[in-house]
Amino acid sequence: MIVYTFTNTVSTSNTYVLCLEKEGIAWVIDPGDTSPIFKCLKENDSSLEGVLLTHSHYDHIYGTNDLFLAFPNAKLFVSQKASTGLFSPKHNLSRYSRNHQPYRVRKLDYICVSEDSRIHLNDDSILDVIETPGHHPGCLSFSIGEELF
């Protein structure tokens, strides 16, 4: 697995792309600016398997709609507490931004994960879910091997 990190233009949040080169698939954590994500997917000849959200503030989700337009069968993972922010500009805070339009995720189906959930990235790689409330009550962290997101 190769991990790519991109710093986004909105609030300098980070997006991570996990490329599983053998399978030709990738997973994205906290999609922001989509140009570097699409470039990374193309350069690694990978299709998007899923999107993982640490929480649902706007600066961590604003690339979601563009990704699901290109990869409609990809899965979306979020905590139950953060799921309200997918569809509420008030809860994802985009409503209060002077620079952006109110944002809503258009993908209606998502998978709620919580503490001790495990997400199979492929047959060999499993991502562990850790609840880390604080910045947002629905915050999640993801762990795989030595990597923590």
Predicted feature residues:
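Catalytic core of the metallo-beta-lactamase
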Residues: 1-46, 103-149
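Active-site HxH/HxHxD metal-binding segment of metal-dependent hydrolases
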Residues: 33-123
